[in-house]
Amino acid sequence: MKIGIIGAMEEEVNFLRDKMENRVATTIANCEFTEGQIGAVQVVLTRCGIGKVNAALATTLLNDRFQPDAIINTGVAGGLNASMAVGDLVISTEVRYHDVDATVFGYEYGQVPGMVPAYLPDATLIAAAKTAAQKVGFHSEEGLIVTGDSFMGEETRVNEVKTLFPAAYCAEMEAGAIAQVCHQFQTPFVIIRALSDVAGQDAKMSYDTFLEKSAVNSAKQVMLMLDHLSA
């Protein structure tokens, strides 16, 4: 089994890279790919850069050049649900865009014309993520993750997104693009995000303080997922 793992920033991938053996690094179009092994699992770890275009580019290259059996996106996000706190984990059961509006043409809000309204992660990967979350001991929830090309630090926009997507647990900047590309390639995927901040509530201060810790929380869950998938 070969698993592709994508993180946007160095803080989101360095913990996993340090755990890899037999590493071989390649850079394509400013996207960093590191092949190697974590335990019994062959891994291609990808640092894609921030935002939807960077994420789509890296996910396309990952699928085309390395052909993984599945893709896991790890990283941090801004929380949208009052029941969750910084450091908690969100496991995707659905991924949508919060910054796409083609409703005038009859599409759902968040739906890219010609594409599905929501991208659904693989059930086996969701189950593995849930098992890993229980083992690692972090509080986790499963549900909707929304994506857009903006940091959710402005209270008015946060409230707009909450109104549009009341079921959303968190917002971030890459998952929707990763999910859309995986949908096109028919590659199973799941998104794992740890909360680095609560969107709109001193979000930047919290993000700066908790980025690395939350990123490691997400990466630790991915490590346990790999153990489960290789069993």
UniProtKB/Swiss-Prot annotation:
The protein's annotated catalytic reaction(s) are: S-adenosyl-L-homocysteine + H2O = S-(5-deoxy-D-ribos-5-yl)-L-homocysteine + adenine; S-methyl-5'-thioadenosine + H2O = 5-(methylsulfanyl)-D-ribose + adenine; 5'-deoxyadenosine + H2O = 5-deoxy-D-ribose + adenine
Q: Where does substrate bind?
A: 78, 152, 173-174
Q: What's any GO biological process attached to this entry?
A: nucleoside catabolic process
| GO CC entries | cytosol
Q: EC number(s) of the enzyme?
A: 3.2.2.9
Keyword field contains Amino-acid biosynthesis: yes
* GO MF: adenosylhomocysteine nucleosidase activity; methylthioadenosine nucleosidase activity
Q: Which residues of this protein are catalytic?
A: 12, 197
Tell me the keywords, alphabetical order.
Amino-acid biosynthesis, Hydrolase, Methionine biosynthesis
Q: Name one Pfam family in it.
A: PNP_UDP_1
Pathway(s): Amino-acid biosynthesis; L-methionine biosynthesis via salvage pathway; S-methyl-5-thio-alpha-D-ribose 1-phosphate from S-methyl-5'-thioadenosine (hydrolase route): step 1/2
Q: Domain of life of the organism in this record? A: Bacteria
What the entry lists under HAMAP family is as follows:
Salvage_MtnN
Per the entry, what this protein does is: Catalyzes the irreversible cleavage of the glycosidic bond in both 5'-methylthioadenosine (MTA) and S-adenosylhomocysteine (SAH/AdoHcy) to adenine and the corresponding thioribose, 5'-methylthioribose and S-ribosylhomocysteine, respectively. Also cleaves 5'-deoxyadenosine, a toxic by-product of radical S-adenosylmethionine (SAM) enzymes, into 5-deoxyribose and adenine.
Q: Which PANTHER family match?
A: 5'-METHYLTHIOADENOSINE/S-ADENOSYLHOMOCYSTEINE NUCLEOSIDASE (PTHR46832), 5'-METHYLTHIOADENOSINE_S-ADENOSYLHOMOCYSTEINE NUCLEOSIDASE (PTHR46832:SF1)
> Can you tell me which family this protein belongs to?
Belongs to the PNP/UDP phosphorylase family. MtnN subfamily.
Annotated protein name in UniProt: 5'-methylthioadenosine/S-adenosylhomocysteine nucleosidase
What is the originating organism of this protein? Shouchella clausii (strain KSM-K16)
